[in-house]
Amino acid sequence: MNEYCFNLNLDIYPLRNDVSLDDLPKEQWNLISVDVINPDLLSFLKLKGINISVVSSFYDSGTNFEQKIHIDFPTMCDMTKLIWAWGEHHVMNWYMPEDQNNLEFVIDKNSTNPSNGIRNYSVYDRQSLNVVHTSKIGFPSLIQVGIPHQGINFAGVRRSLTVILHDEKNNVIPMNRARSIFKSYILP
C-alpha cells in the first residue's frame, strides 16, 4: 500500500444537485465557494470530524498537459485533499528530492496563480526530484499534497474538484489520519 493516494468507495457526488460541472470556471486552477458542495457530503464529513475551507477546481485540456510539479503549501508538510477527477487519461506523480538537505530544488516559492493571483504554493525543478509513486486518481481519492506532486493529462479534458481536509480545530489532516478516518471506504 502506498502513502500518497487512496481511492475511495464513497458514493456521494461532490456538487450540489443544482450545480453542474460545466458551471465551474474553465481556468487551469480556480478557487471556488464551499457553497457549491453537496450538503450530503458536508454532513458526511462533519460526522467524521472533518471541515473543509478551501475548494478548488482544475481544468486541464489538451494532449500531454503537465501541471508544474508543486506542493499546495509554501513548505513541505503532511497534508491531505479529497479529490474527484473526471476524464480517462490522466495520472498523478509524487516526487521526493534527491537530497532533502538541499532546498535549491524549489524554483518558485510562494508562487501565485496567474489566473487570480491568490495561490500560495511552491514549484519544483524536475531535475532534482525522483518519482516515488504514480497513480490514476479515483472518484474520489485521498491524495497527499504536502510533498511535490503533478497531474498529467495524456488526452482529452481532465476536470477535478479538490477540498483540503481540516479537523475541528482547523488543523490540516495528515495522510495517516485521513486513511484511518476513511479506512472502511478505501478500495483495495
Language-model regions: role of each:
Residues M1-S43, F139, A155-G156, D167-P188:
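N-terminal auxiliary "cap/dimerization" subdomain that precedes the catalytic jelly-roll/cupin core
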Residues E3, M79-K81, R158-S160:
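Short hydrophobic/aromatic beta-strand or adjacent loop that forms the aromatic wall/cage
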Residues S43-T63:
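A short glycine-rich, His/Asp/Glu-containing loop-to-beta-strand
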Residues E3, I52-S56, H89-N93, E98-N101, ...:
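Generic structural motif
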Residues S56-S57, I69-D72, I143-G146, V163:
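Short His-Asn-centered micro-motif
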Residues S61-I137:
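Catalytic core of non-heme Fe(II) oxygenases with the double-stranded beta-helix
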Residues N113-P188:
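Catalytic core of Fe(II)/2-oxoglutarate
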